Curated annotation (Swiss-Prot):
InterPro entries: DNA_mismatch_repair_MutS_C, DNA_mismatch_repair_MutS_core, DNA_mismatch_repair_MutS_sf, MSSS, MutS, MutS2, P-loop_NTPase, Smr_dom
Function: Endonuclease that is involved in the suppression of homologous recombination and thus may have a key role in the control of bacterial genetic diversity. Acts as a ribosome collision sensor, splitting the ribosome into its 2 subunits. Detects stalled/collided 70S ribosomes which it binds and splits by an ATP-hydrolysis driven conformational change. Acts upstream of the ribosome quality control system (RQC), a ribosome-associated complex that mediates the extraction of incompletely synthesized nascent chains from stalled ribosomes and their subsequent degradation. Probably generates substrates for RQC.
GO biological process: mismatch repair; negative regulation of DNA recombination; rescue of stalled ribosome
Keywords: ATP-binding, DNA-binding, Endonuclease, Hydrolase, Nuclease, Nucleotide-binding, RNA-binding, rRNA-binding
HAMAP family in UniProt: MutS2 (MF_00092)
Gene: mutS2
Residues at which ATP binds: 334-341
Protein biosynthesis recorded as keyword: no
Disulphide bonds in the chain: none
Protein name as catalogued: Endonuclease MutS2
Subunit and partners: Homodimer. Binds to stalled ribosomes, contacting rRNA.
Species assigned in the record: Pediococcus pentosaceus (strain ATCC 25745 / CCUG 21536 / LMG 10740 / 183-1w)
Residues in Smr domain copies: 710-785
Length: 785
C-alpha cells in the first residue's frame, strides 16, 4: 500500500490510538511496522485472530501479557558468549514466565470450551523452558538484583557482610555517644571511600587514631576511620569484593544456561508481542464499538452505519455506504461543508483498517473488499482560492493515479476537476471518471458541478449521492443520501435569511427551466426517500419484535417439551415400580398356593406361569420413547357378576362374585376370595376352554411336564432368554431345587447372556458351570433359593 494514502487518510493516527493499549516493546515494534495487506488470506487470518482477541477480552478481560522489554540485543550478545547483567536476565525470566502463563491461560480456555478460531495455531508455537525459568526465578529479583539463593557461596558471603557491618556500626556508634560527642562535628556514622567513618573536628584528630579518608570543604571536619574498626572494615571490604566476584560468576553461569535457547526466546518474545498487539486491537475495537468486517465474496463494499474513527464517537454521524456490485462509481454532488470529504475518507480509512486486521466502526455484517492499492486526491475542500497552481497540483496527482489503476484499485477524488473554469472542469471530471471505469477500478468522487448529476444517471455502473441539508435549521445533517444527487438550496436559504423576495424572484427567472426542473425532481426524490426510509425503519422494528416474540415462543416450547419429557420419565419410573411390586406380590401368592398341596380340588400351574409372564412383559425401560403401560389408557367399563377379570395388582385372572360397594368387588382367584378395588380390575374375554371351578386345593398338574434340563442350543439370543425366563418360573412352581441350562459353547454370546440374566434374577441362589464330564462351560447348573 502506497505511503501517500496512509498519510492522506491519517492511518498513523489510528495506530497512535492503538498504541495506548500496548504493554510490550515487541508489540509496539509490530504496531510501528503494521501496514494494510492486499493478500486476502493474510487479511482473513488477521481478522480471525482479532476476533479471538475480542472474544477473550469480552470474556476474560484480555490475554495475560505483562509489560515486557525487547531482549533482542541481549540475545544477540549471548550468541557471542557474552555475559548478561542481572536486569537483562530478569527480563528473560519475565518472558519465560509470561510464556507459561499464556499457555496455561489458553489451556483453561479449552477446558472451559471457549471457542478459539485462529490463535490456537499461534499458541502452539510458544515453548516453555521450565528448568531455565525456575533457575532464573530462584536467582534474580525483578529489578535484576541477585538473590541470596542464587548460590550457597553468595549466601555465606552476604551473611558475613551483614555480621561485619553490624559489628562495625556497633563500635562506631560508641563514638557518637557519651564523652566522645564533643570531639565530633556531628554525632553520626557515615561512609567515605566505601568505609565507615565519623566526622571528627580537626583539632581532635588524635583522639581517634586510624585513617583519614576525607575532609570537609571548610577544612574543619575530618572523616576518620577509627583505629579500632580498621581491621573490621578491611574484612568487610574483602567480603564485598568476594561478593562482586561471586555475582559475576553467577551471572556468567546463568548466561551460559540461557544461551542455547536464544532462538526459542526470540520467537517467544515475538509471539508475546503479537498477542499484546491483538489485545490492543481488541481494546480499541471495544472503545470504538467496532465490529468484525466481512470480506465480500462479490467484491462489494457495504458499510452499515459507518463512522469515521478519528471523530468523537458521541458526535460523529454514521452513514450507510455501498459501492461495488451493481455500480463501481459513486458521485457525491452538492455544496461544500456538508461532509462529502469526511464520507470519502471514512470509506478509505475503514478499508485500510480492515486490511490491517482491525475491526471497523460500523454495524455488524458490514462488508469490505481487498484492494491492492488505494489512491486519493484529497485537497482542502474549504479553500476559497482555487488558482492555477492548485489545479496543476491536483492534476499531477490525478495523472499519477490514472497510471496505476487496475481492477483491484480504489480511487478517491475530492472535488474532481476543481480549480479551473467550471465547464472545462466538469468536462475533465467526466472524462477522468470514464477512464477510471475503463480500468475496472472502483471510485468515489465528490463534486459541486451540476453536470455530474446527469453523469450519475446516464452512465451504466454509476450512482449519484448527496449530503442531506436541513433547510429548516440551515445546517447540514451529514447524512449520505444514496441515489439522490445534491440540490442547490441557495434560494431557500437566502429567503430564510431575509433576502428581499423580489431579488429571489428575479434570480429564479435567470435560472433556466431545466435546472429548475432538476432541482424540483431532486426535492421530490428526497421527500420520497425519507418516506421510504421511515417505512423501512418501521418494518425493521416490527421484524425485530417478531423475532423476539419468536425466540420467546421457541424457548417456551422447549421448556414445555423438557417438562413433558421429565413428566413422562417420572411416570415410567412410577409404572415400573408398580410392576415390580406386582411381581413380588405374585411370587408371594405362588408360594402360598404351593402350601395347599394337601387340599382337595385342582389348580393349573400353567395359568400361574402365564400370569407371571404377562407381569414380566409389562416392565418398560425408562429411556423408551413410548411406554406401553402409560400408552394403554384405561377405558370406562361396567362390571357384572360372573365377569372374568384380571386383578392388576397380582396379574391373576379371576371371576367377579358380587359387588361389595361402588368401589369394590369380591373376586374369586383360584381358591382365594378377595375384596378388590374397581381401579385394580380389568375385564377380559372368557377362555374358550371349559372352566373348572377350583375348590379347596391345588393339584400339581404341570410339574410332571417340567424337565430338570433346558436345552437352548440352536436358539436365537432373544428367543433363548424368553424361554429361559418361562422355564425358571415353571421350575420354581414344580418345586425343583436346581436345574441345568444347556446353552452350548459356540461364540459365547448366549452363555454370557444367560449368565447376565441369572445374576440379575433375585430368585436364583447360585449357579456354576457343569462338571467337565457333564458339558463343562457349555451348560450351567442353577440353584434356587
Amino acid at each position: 500500500m502506497n505511503k501517500k494514502i496512509l498519510d492522506v487518510l491519517e492511518y498513523d493516527k489510528i495506530k497512535q490510538s492503538i498504541r495506548q493499549f500496548i504493554a510490550t516493546e515487541n508489540g509496539t515494534k509490530e504496531l510501528r511496522e503494521l501496514v494494510p495487506s492486499s493478500d486476502e488470506t493474510e487479511v482473513r487470518n488477521a481478522l480471525k485472530q482479532t476476533l479471538d482477541a475480542v472474544n477473550i477480552y469480552r470474556l476474560k478481560n484480555g490475554i495475560p501479557v505483562p509489560r515486557l522489554e525487547d531482549v533482542t540485543e541481549a540475545l544477540q550478545r549471548l550468541k557471542i558468549d557474552a555475559a548478561l547483567n542481572g536486569q537483562e536476565l530478569a527480563q528473560i525470566g519475565r518472558i519465560l514466565r509470561a510464556t507459561r502463563t499464556v499457555i496455561n491461560f489458553f489451556d483453561d480456555l479449552e477446558n472451559e470450551e471457549i471457542e478459539i478460531i485462529a490463535l490456537d495455531q499461534v499458541i502452539e508455537q510458544l515453548v516453555t523452558i521450565p528448568e531455565v525459568e525456575e533457575r532464573l526465578s530462584n536467582s534474580i529479583e525483578g529489578n535484576g538484583h541477585l538473590l541470596n539463593s542464587a548460590s550457597s557461596e553468595l549466601r555465606r558471603i552476604r551473611a558475613s557482610i551483614t555480621r561485619i557491618e553490624s559489628d562495625v556500626r556497633s563500635r562506631m556508634e560508641k563514638f557518637t555517644r557519651g564523652n566522645n560527642v564533643k570531639y565530633l562535628s556531628e554525632p553520626i556514622v557515615t561512609i567515605r571511600n566505601e568505609r565507615y567513618v565519623i566526622p571528627a573536628r580537626v583539632e581532635y584528630r588524635s583522639k581517634f587514631g586510624g585513617v583519614v579518608h576525607d575532609q570537609s570543604s571548610s577544612g574543619q571536619t575530618l572523616y576518620v576511620e577509627p583505629e579500632s574498626v580498621v581491621d573490621l572494615n578491611n574484612e568487610l571490604r574483602q567480603n564485598q569484593v568476594a561478593e562482586v566476584h561471586e555475582e559475576q560468576r553467577i551471572l556468567q553461569e546463568l548466561s551460559a544456561l540461557v544461551a542455547p535457547y536464544t532462538d526459542t526466546l526470540k520467537d517467544n518474545s515475538r509471539i508475546l508481542g503479537h498477542l499484546d498487539l491483538l489485545n490492543a486491537k481488541a481494546q480499541y475495537a471495544h472503545q470504538l464499538k467496532a465490529t468484525e468486517p466481512q470480506i465480500s465474496a462479490s467484491n462489494e463494499i457495504n458499510l452499515r452505519e459507518a463512522r469515521h474513527p478519528l471523530i468523537d464517537q458521541k458526535k460523529v454521524v454514521s452513514n450507510d455506504i455501498r459501492l461495488g456490485g451493481e455500480y463501481e462509481t459513486l458521485v457525491i454532488t452538492g455544496p461544500n461543508t456538508g461532509g462529502k470529504t469526511i464520507t470519502l475518507k471514512t470509506v478509505g480509512l475503514l478499508q485500510l483498517m480492515a486490511q490491517s486486521g482491525m475491526f471497523i466502526p460500523a454495524n455488524e455484517n458490514s462488508t469490505v473488499r481487498i484492494f491492492e492499492e488505494i489512491f486519493a486526491d484529497i485537497g482542502d475542500e474549504q479553500s476559497i482560492e482555487q488558482n492555477l497552481s492548485t489545479f496543476s497540483s491536483h492534476m499531477d496527482n490525478t495523472i499519477r493515479i490514472l497510471g496505476n489503476l487496475n481492477e483491484r484499485s480504489l480511487a478517491l477524488f475530492d472535488e474532481l476537476g476543481a480549480g479551473t473554469d467550471p465547464k472545462e472542469g466538469a468536462a475533465l471530471a467526466i472524462a477522468i471518471l470514464d477512464k477510471v471505469r475503463s480500468t475496472g477500478a472502483v471510485s468515489m468522487t465528490t463534486t459541486h458541478y451540476p453536470e455530474l448529476k446527469t453523469y450519475g444517471y446516464e452512465r451504466m455502473g454509476t450512482i449519484n449521492a448527496s449530503m442531506e441539508f436541513d433547510v429548516d435549521t440551515l445546517q447540514p445533517t451529514y447524512k449520505l443520501l444514496l441515489g439522490i444527487p445534491g440540490q442547490s438550496n441557495a434560494f431557500e436559504i437566502s429567503k430564510r435569511l431575509g433576502l428581499d423576495s423580489d431579488i429571489i424572484s428575479q434570480a429564479r427567472g435567470l435560472v433556466d427551466q431545466d435546472s429548475q426542473d432538476l432541482n424540483n425532481m431532486i426535492k421530490d426524490l428526497t421527500t420520497r426517500q425519507k418516506r421510504a426510509q421511515k417505512i423501512n425503519q418501521q418494518a425493521v422494528e416490527l421484524l425485530k419484535q417478531a423475532e423476539e416474540y419468536h425466540q420467546t415462543l421457541v424457548k417456551g416450547v422447549d421448556s414445555l417439551n423438557s417438562q413433558r419429557s421429565n413428566l413422562i420419565e417420572s411416570a415410567k419410573e412410577d409404572a415400573n415400580r408398580i410392576v415390580n411390586d406386582s411381581q413380588a406380590e405374585a411370587d408371594r401368592i405362588i408360594k402360598r398356593l404351593r402350601k395347599l398341596e394337601h387340599s382337595t380340588g385342582s389348580f393349573k400351574e400353567n395359568d400361574l406361569i402365564d400370569a407371571k409372564s404377562k407381569i414380566n412383559a409389562l416392565h418398560q425401560d425408562t429411556n423408551l420413547k413410548r411406554n406401553k403401560v402409560l400408552r394403554r389408557a384405561k377405558e370406562a367399563q361396567k362390571f357384572h357378576e360372573n365377569d372374568e377379570v384380571v386383578v392388576l395388582t397380582y396379574g391373576q385372572r379371576g371371576e367377579l362374585l358380587r359387588q361389595v360397594d361402588k368401589k369394590h368387588w369380591e373376586v374369586q382367584m383360584g381358591i382365594m376370595k378377595m375384596k378388590v378395588a374397581v381401579d385394580e380390575l380389568e375385564k377380559v374375554k372368557p377362555d374358550k376352554t371349559v372352566k373348572r371351578r377350583v375348590h379347596n386345593s391345588v393339584q400339581r398338574t404341570a410339574s410332571a411336564g417340567v424337565k430338570t434340563t433346558l436345552d437352548l442350543r440352536g436358539k436365537r439370543y432373544e428367543e433363548a432368554l424368553t424361554e429361559t425366563d418361562r422355564y425358571i418360573d415353571a421350575a420354581l412352581l414344580a418345586g425343583y431345587d436346581e436345574v441345568t441350562i444347556v446353552h452350548g459353547k459356540g461364540t459365547g454370546a448366549l452363555r454370557s447372556g444367560i449368565t447376565k440374566y441369572l445374576k440379575n434374577n433375585r430368585r436364583i441362589k447360585a449357579f456354576e458351570y457343569a462338571p467337565a464330564n457333564a458339558g463343562g462351560n457349555g451348560a450351567t447348573i442353577v440353584h434356587f433359593k
